[in-house]
């Protein structure tokens, strides 16, 4: 009675074909200008989908509002009048699953002025 199961022969160590390792790449974008930030986000996601990568995001993080209140008068006299200044920092997070070489091609797009980009690579 012949069996269809045949044991595999052990191959030599180090001669296996190297598989392209998939990494989880997190791209964090932050800016004071929402329009520029959204434009860079859409360009990144479009480029990743053209390369047929798995994309999560853009995830909109809470806007940080930094407020400073100061007196208008330089000296201590006069009516107490106050100036209120605020700075809004918007943040987006995009997760890609691919090799670092492909991400380098995707992130070579033109980034709008005022948009900060942070790329973190982790094993998935």
Swiss-Prot record:
A single Gene Ontology CC term: cytosol
Sections of the chain in a coiled coil: none
Top-rank lineage group of the source organism: Eukaryota
Record keywords, A-Z: Ribonucleoprotein, Ribosomal protein
Single GO BP term: translation
Molecular function GO terms recorded: mRNA binding; structural constituent of ribosome
Family note: Belongs to the universal ribosomal protein uS10 family.
NCBIfam families reported for this sequence: uS10_euk_arch
PANTHER family, sorted: 30S RIBOSOMAL PROTEIN S10 FAMILY MEMBER
Protein name (database record): Small ribosomal subunit protein uS10z/uS10x
Organism annotation: Arabidopsis thaliana (Mouse-ear cress)
